[in-house]
Amino acid sequence: MWIKSQHIKAASIIIGWLSSLAFGASAQNPVQADSAQAPYDSAIAEALSGTLVCYSAPRTTEHQWLFSIGGENLLDTYLSPLAYKGTTMGTSFRTERFTHFGAQRWTVRARYSLHAAYLASPTDNGKEWDMQLSGSGALLYNFSLYTGWRFAAGGALEGRTGFTYNTRNGNNPAQGRAAVAFAATGLAEYTLRVGNKPIRIRTEADFPLVGLMFSPNYGQSYYEIFSLGHYDKNVRVTFPGNAPELRWTTTLSLPFRKARLSIGYEAEIRQHRINGLKYHAWNHRFLIGYTRHIYVVK
């Protein structure tokens, strides 16, 4: 079904990470955190009410922290021909605000996440540790077709790095990963009110279109790449044909004191077939966290 595992001596790999994103989604000069009953819940909430252009609303930034737990199914034929399964846990942070241009039609969004998983082979005699760090910056155009709805679509530049460590492999214990991609992104939000309490349902998706990915070639060791300098198509172009990927997140946000309690579900599908190697990481996660808005001086 899958190609045989290559027992190759692997050197450790340290991969640099994006130090910052082009989109500065963090606001300056915060003056007040909102409550669920605030008259201007945020500029984004004004869009939810059906009025996208709201010049009287203070400029706001939305911050959301989410914590996750779920299951992961991982296959990396550089390490093993078997798919490993186990528990994944992680955290993510999202910040979003309207731009200074475009009459509050455009928003910028930054998102960062860190996930780790402990996995076992089908016979439970092999274990793997998996870690991924990712970040993205997006620019989205907002529009509303119906009262209470907000839609947005745009593009995102995203990058990620990580590794998988297999406890059974003596000569070939680890695989490092690094990739950047341009992705299409979109979201839909709906806000309803129960009494004077706003409740928001949000669903969003990211679909990478084209990018670059590091990968050793079939039968190639990290010693050959980094010590001997033997390059063998180790940076490859990715697109949906060889690396179909999708992240889909849905959350429900409920008023809770001066913030919002957010619960939801996330599916993240990462897979590729490059350099004669197959990889997939299928994740399903339960989410819980909180969302806040910070009012700022224009």
Where are these regions (language model features)?
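Short glycine/proline- and aromatic-enriched beta-strand/turn motifs that initiate or cap beta-hairpins
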Residues: Q28-R109
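Residues that define the transmembrane beta-barrel architecture of outer-membrane proteins
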Residues: H63, A83-T91, K127-G135, W149, ...
